[in-house]
Design a protein with these regions (language model features):
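A substrate-engagement module of RecA-like helicase motors
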Residues: 2-20, 26, 76-78, 83-218, ...
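Walker A/P-loop
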Residues: 44-66
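Signature of the SF2 helicase/ATPase Hel1-core->accessory helical subdomain module
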Residues: 64, 70, 90, 94-98, ...
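Conserved RecA-like ASCE P-loop NTPase motor core of nucleic-acid helicases/translocases
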Residues: 78-87, 456-460, 535-542, 669-670
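A contiguous, basic/glycine-rich beta-loop/short-helix subdomain that forms a polymer-engagement track
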Residues: 185-218, 228-237, 366-506, 517, ...
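Metal-dependent catalytic core segments for phosphate chemistry
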Residues: 251-277, 452-527, 552, 560-564, ...
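Conserved RecA-like P-loop NTPase helicase motor core
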Residues: 503-515, 566-675
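Conserved helicase motor "Helicase C" RecA-like lobe of SF1/SF2 P-loop NTPases
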Residues: 542-566
Length: 718
């Protein structure tokens, strides 16, 4: 479809009307360019897909929503906007789309959250009830559906009142009641524990109400994990050919896809025996009480017993083999180099894939048959069997996916990482097997790039080291296929608004020097606090260990510090905002997750402290296998893995400072490698153009280290 004059006029009219809705709106050339590029892509006028980097201040959300809605209406398609996390998803749903509704009055939009974000009304009813008979009935369906105490029951009763009176839509993020994770895990549900259409609460269930709203919406706000799952199962969202898809925070997509395709399952022999025995009993119950129309051959007791016996013997053999690779009786991990399994293990995995597929098919057959019997049997007993069969199906599906992946030598042209772990819980040993592909470009090509006609991938940061090459390699997007890659200019004047400070540290932030380096960092940080130039500050660390060491050096400032983990992030940010707005000094302290999605303007954040260049950890099985593979191709892992990742992290960290034309301040980076190493200049060149200063650092004597040195020299003298 070409961009008609009428369509261009509609987009221009909405953009002009938007300017009247936003106080102090500043027209920005990069925003107009993004609107044009997005419109050309979604209308199919230019290229297949578009990857567009839109730095902070461009206004990327509205820049894709305006042309996206206009083209979706013209083509009678659904615009799906996907984000990396629930917080950003909720911001678009609760803030940006309601703003657009002021200029597009009949705009219909909804949000698609994962099942686990919604309350299950069946579980809520059980936990809110004070009637023993009601609790007994629901406890029969699920053993964990009785309240632990009176306070829990009262909270659940309040939530139920809010849900019943439509004051609450059932989404965890939309209630002002504090619900801890332990309680929420019992209030929500998962696919394996959901009765779906067979549930008494199906029509009013918040999850299914939200799913039905998707069919009527023009705009659906989802997240990457849900989109990947929906494309795999062809459920939830409209058909791919009827979609316009925008992937915001698109730099997360390869990792989300890899996480979605990672398979792990417990293979402890006694546990596995128990699961198989329970399944055999469940099949026997179905045959006796809910006889299916046609009897599957595998449901024959003797045949099913023999099938499960072979499966168990293979699992037991695999346990014995894996135990040879790990120290006896203790927690351990073994990774198979380059993902290459011994021939014997590979043959076991291939056979397990076939056997678990047959059990998966049997469980699915019984589940479908049971779902058709809800009007002719005791509902409570039937529902209990339905739940148990649904969980059995979930287990066999997971096992089957695991063994199929384990049977592959490669995925997307790269090895599949394979490893086993042994953990000890409550004195009991548990063995797990894990598989994940180190590249997911083929899967993304199949699920997204080839299925959806036109997709926009956007983020404030898509490049690393001024290049899209890492994104292209990890995602499978490529210019040869007609994909376009655009990097917009920042609308801010970084030279005038801020500067980078690299203190003259005596030590590099390496493990051997960590104590001395953090002591120096703490001394310079203290100096900055005492100068009282900045009300709002942020300190970012690459590891929790380093953050805790730093806190030991600034215990006298602890009341000023709002540390990640003390409270939920949104509460820390709320408290920080209140402090600064009342004229108090406040310091947020956190890890890399605080370098993303934190939008604090002006005095709320005028100084950012960065502990060191955040290279990715090198002890992950996936990273190690990728390194082995790259070396086998004569590629340098530091150049392909570590440096692009570090560049990306640094760009995000530095990007916390200048969020508007009125922002100002400094970014302090406590890592002299930016000036002393060859790669330092490349990392700096990828950052916004700030002037750089190199002040001195107060001299620090590290007492702890001095004591250790004295002890060591004492030993030598003796």
């Amino acid at each position: 479809m070409a961009l008609t004059a009428a369509l261009k006029a509609q987009i221009a009219a909405w953009y002009k009307a938007l300017q009247e809705q936003i106080p102090d709106f500043i027209p920005r050339p990069p925003q107009r360019q993004m609107i044009a590029d997005v419109a050309k892509t979604l209308a199919g006028e230019e290229g297949r897909h578009l990857a567009i980097e839109a730095p902070t201040g461009v206004g990327k959300t509205l820049s894709y929503l305006i042309p996206g809605i206009a083209i979706a209406r013209e083509e009678q398609k659904t615009l799906v906007v996907s984000t990396a996390n629930v917080a950003l998803q909720d911001q678009i749903y609760s803030k940006d789309l309601p703003l657009l509704r002021k200029i597009i009055p009949d705009l219909r939009f909804t949000a698609a959250f994962g099942r686990g974000r919604y309350v299950c009304p069946r579980n809520l009813t059980a936990l809110a009830s004070t009637e023993p008979s009601q609790q007994d009935l629901l406890a029969f369906l699920d053993d964990d559906l009785t309240p632990n105490n009176q306070a829990e029951q009262k909270l659940c009763a309040t939530l139920k009142q809010d849900l019943d009176s439509y004051r609450w839509d059932g989404l965890r993020d939309h209630t002002d009641k504090a619900i801890d994770d332990a309680l929420w895990s019992r209030l929500s549900t998962d696919k394996a524990s959901c009765l779906n259409r067979n549930c008494h609460y199906y029509r009013e269930c918040p999850f299914f109400v939200a799913r039905r709203e998707i069919q009527e919406a023009e705009v659906v706000v989802a997240n990457h994990a849900l989109v990947m799952a929906a494309m795999e199962s062809e459920a939830v969202l409209p058909e791919p050919k009827n979609l316009l898809l925008v992937l915001d925070e698109g730099h997360h997509l390869p990792d989300v896809a890899r996480d979605a395709l990672e398979m792990s399952a417990e293979i402890t022999a006694p546990w596995f025996r128990l699961q198989l025995d329970l399944f055999c009993k469940l099949v026997a119950t179905c045959m006796e009480q809910f006889r299916p129309k046609t009897t599957p051959p595998l449901a024959n007791p003797e045949r099913l017993t023999g099938h499960c016996e072979e499966l168990f013997e293979l699992i037991a053999s695999l346990n014995n083999i894996l135990n040879l690779y790990m120290p006896a009786g203790q927690e351990a991990e073994h990774r198979f180099p380059m993902g290459e399994l011994p021939q014997e293990v590979m043959e076991i995995c291939q056979r397990l894939a076939k056997l678990t597929e047959m059990l998966r098919g049997l469980a699915e057959l019984f589940l479908n048959d049971l779902s058709e019997k809800t009007g002719s049997h005791d509902v409570v007993r039937l529902h209990r069997v339905l739940l148990q069969m649904n969980r059995a199906l979930g287990m066999f599906e997971s096992q089957n996916k695991l063994w199929r992946l384990a049977s592959l030598a490669q995925s997307s042209g790269a090895p599949v990482t394979k490893w086993a772990t042994r953990v000890v819980r409550d004195g009991q040993i548990h063995v797990w097997f894990h598989c994940v592909g180190i590249r997911v470009s083929d899967q993304l090509e199949r699920l997204l790039w080839r299925s959806v006609p036109h997709i926009v991938v956007t983020s404030a940061t898509l490049r690393s080291l001024n290049s899209f090459s890492r994104l292209q390699e990890m995602s499978g997007l490529k210019e040869k296929a007609g994909d376009r890659f655009v990097a917009l200019d920042s609308p801010f004047n970084h030279v005038e608004q801020g500067k980078i400070i690299i203190p003259q540290m005596r030590y590099e932030p390496l493990m051997d020097n960590e104590e001395q380096h953090i002591a120096e960092m703490a001394a310079y940080f203290r100096q900055q606090v005492e100068s009282k130039k900045h009300l709002g500050m942020l300190v970012l660390f690459a590891s929790g260990r380093a953050m805790n060491r730093f806190l030991e050096h600034v215990t006298d400032l602890r009341l000023m510090l709002l540390v990640q983990g003390d409270q939920p992030r949104y509460r820390l940010v709320e408290l920080h905002r209140k402090r600064v707005e009342s004229g108090e000094r406040s310091v947020l302290v956190g890890l890399q997750s605080f370098a993303e999605g934190l939008d604090l303007k002006g005095d709320l954040l005028s100084q950012v402290h960065i502990h060191k260049i955040a290279f990715p950890p090198i002890d992950s099985p996936v990273v190690i296998t990728e390194g082995e593979w790259l070396k086998s191709l004569n590629r340098y892992p530091f150049e392909v893995q570590s440096l692009p990742s570090a560049s990306f992290n640094l760009i995000q960290q530095v990007g916390r400072l200048i969020r508007s034309h009125h922002c100002w301040g400094e970014v302090v980076i406590y890592d002299k490698r930016l000036l002393t190493k060859n790669y330092g200049a490349r990392l700096l060149n990828a950052l916004p153009v700030f002037p750089i200063e190199q002040p001195g650092v107060p001299e620090v004597i590290v007492k702890r280290k001095a004591k250790q040195t004295a002890k060591q020299s004492g030993r030598k003298r003796r």
